[in-house]
Each structure stands twice: as structure tokens, then as C-alpha cells.
Amino acid sequence: MKILVVNCGSSSLKYQLIDMTSEEALAKGLVERIGIEGSILTQKVNGEKYIIEEPMKDHKKAIELVLKALVDKEHGVISDMSEIAAVGHRVVHGGEKYASSVLIDDEVMEALEDCVKLAPLHNPPNIIGINACRELMPKTPMVAVFDTAFHQTLPDYAYMYPLPYELYEQNGIRKYGFHGTSHRYVSSVASEMMGKDLKDLKVITCHLGNGASLCAVKEGKSVETSMGFTPLAGLAMGTRCGDIDPAILLFMERELKMSPDEVDTVINKKSGVLGISGVSSDFRDIEGAAEEGNKRAKLALDVYHYTVRQTIGAYTAVLNGVDAIVFTAGLGENSAASREEILNGLEYLGIKIDAEKNKQRGKQIEISTEDSKVKVFVIPTDEELMIARDTKEITAK
């Protein structure tokens, strides 16, 4: 059984064709600059690159070219489109309606449109991608897998903001959380590595990329997460500010005479480690600058590590203890220095790190010592595989 996994952005599209027998990706691809001059599709099969450069006015044209690349006689991996058993779509926001993945029909599409107000940047391109696939592959079942779904198990006291209750009832203003597919994947892998049932474990998962969030997993369910109503909340990130005093935004508008759009740009695109360091949003650049003595770069890293450490401490309280901590995503998988800094100061939990194992980059590995009271893992995330598994399970029903 072969499943196509699609992740649509506003002008880009990532895809993988996964053979579910071996759970291996037969092809991985990226389409860039959709609707802009210089559109390009890059597909990788066994390390070999295949490139298509031609105008793509919209996502429908992009998906046409994806299918063309997959069945290409020389560079493709299937002989006919009918080999694609189903398509799994990453959808950022499922609102309160969806606590799990769902088979897409017209009713689901209406519900996705209703969620646009909650994710105005992300859901529209997700919807466009689904519509394009449905048009080009009308007989192929499609499944929506939501970033928010895993966190729908949060208790009401964890997702409710202390605002007038009507804002929640009438406008859906509450904590939703994101990166759910990643948190779900790495927590399940951690339980396998420990040889235990996830339902018997208390796990804190740290998805640390340019966007970053933590999740507290108890009895296999998300009970707390750091992102909120939007992916802006929680930790300091690459360019996002994370949790700040909301009155700062009013100060920026009233005293600094900034428009809402200008404030939005500052808190989403000019803040985080980029804002503090003035160097970059790329942690490799900031680590390099800090090593060369750049004080603001060092401060940016200190702030970042502090917010992650602080949140791990809080989630230990939420869970009443912790059995395992997992690091994943770009920084979590590749920065030994960041992992070490984050865990410094958590010795009271009985965490002990094996310095040699911690030097490994991008590998699935346990980095804690044998006598560490808390297991610490680095687990490369695989959201596409999780989407494919859900798609297989739902279309088999």
C-alpha cells in the first residue's frame, strides 16, 4: 500500500510517497515558488535529484507536476497513479471539532473553512491543496491529519484562558497547541525504546526547531503544551517572542504608534532569538557568534534555554514527576550544546547525561546514563510517517 503525504504552504508544497509495507519513503519532494516566477519542483529518489522548472500558477498545477514526477518513466517510483492508495494531508488547525484524523468529505471541508479564522495563514493553503488533490484524484480517499488534534485531550482548566467566558463560547478563544503530530510520534517511539506502554509513562517532549513547543504526555495523552491559541505562545523561538506581558502590545500601539500589522510583524517575524541577538534566527549562526564573544548572541541562547528549562520544570509539576524527556526537531536533534544547557539545573530530578552519547547528531539515541532517574532521548521526528499511518488506518475502516 502506497500513501502520498502532502503538506501545503502558501507558496510551497512538501510531499512524500511512503510504502506502508516497509514504512519507507520511496520519494520525497518539495515544490517552491507556487504562483511566483521561478517555480521549481525537486524530487529525491535514493539520493538522486530530479528537477522540474516550469510555471506553476497555483497548487493544482503543482500537484499535477508532483503526480507527473512520481510516474515519470526515468525518475519516478510508480508506473501509474492508481498505485497511490490514499492521500494524507497535514492540516494545521482542526479547532475543537477534531480530536483525531478524519476521512475527508464535503462536511469536513466545510469545517476546515470554519477553522480559517483560527489559522488564517496556515489553513487556507492546506484547504487549497486538498481541493486540488480531490479534483485531480477524485476516486482516491483523502485523510486530514491535524496539528492540533493530539492536544484536544487537554483538561478544561489547562486550555481555558482567564478571559471573559463569552470569548471562548462565541469566538473559540482558548489554548489549542500545535506540533501535535510530532509530539505524538516521538512520545510513542520513546515508550518503545523504554520497552513500556506509553499509558504507563509520564513523558515531556521538546520539539525545538525554528518554531518550538513542549508537551506533557500522561497516560498516552497530551495534558499540557506550550503553544496556545496560536503558534506564537510559549517558548522564545527563532523569530517569535513566545510568552510576554500582553500589555506590551498595547504599549507598542498606543505609545509607539505602531499599527496592529506592524506589531504582528514584530512579535512573529522580528522577535525570539533573532530579535535579541540581532544576528539570525538560525541557531547555528547564533551559536557561532556566541563562541566568538558576541554578548547578545549568548544572551539570546541563555533566554531560549531558560524558557525551555523553565517549562520542563513546570511540566514535571503538571505530571507529578517525569519518566522521560525527549528532544526532537532541528535544534533538539542536532545541538548537543543546547541539550546540555537546557538540562543543566535539572539535576534535582536525577537526570544524568552521557557526554559522549550527547555528541551524536540527528540520530535516535538515549543520551542519559544507566543510573539516570529520568531517561533522556533524542528522537528525529517523522510527521509524514505519522500522517501516513493515520491515513492507512482510517482508509482501512
Curated annotation (Swiss-Prot):
Disulfide bonds: none annotated. Pathway: Metabolic intermediate biosynthesis; acetyl-CoA biosynthesis; acetyl-CoA from acetate: step 1/2. It catalyses: acetate + ATP = acetyl phosphate + ADP. SUPFAM superfamilies: Actin-like ATPase domain (SSF53067). ATP binds at residues 14, 207-211, 282-284, 330-334. InterPro entries: Ac/propionate_kinase (IPR004372), Aliphatic_acid_kin_short-chain (IPR000890), Aliphatic_acid_kinase_CS (IPR023865), ATPase_NBD (IPR043129). The keyword 4Fe-4S does not apply. Its EC number is 2.7.2.1. Keywords: ATP-binding, Cytoplasm, Kinase, Magnesium, Metal-binding, Nucleotide-binding, Transferase. Pfam families: Acetate_kinase. The record marks 179, 240 as: Transition state stabilizer. It comes from the Bacteria. GO terms for cellular component: cytoplasm. Mg(2+) binds at residues 7, 383. Belongs to the acetokinase family. Catalyzes the formation of acetyl phosphate from acetate and ATP. Can also catalyze the reverse reaction. This is Acetate kinase. The lineage of its organism: Bacteria, Bacillati, Bacillota, Clostridia, Eubacteriales. The gene is ackA.
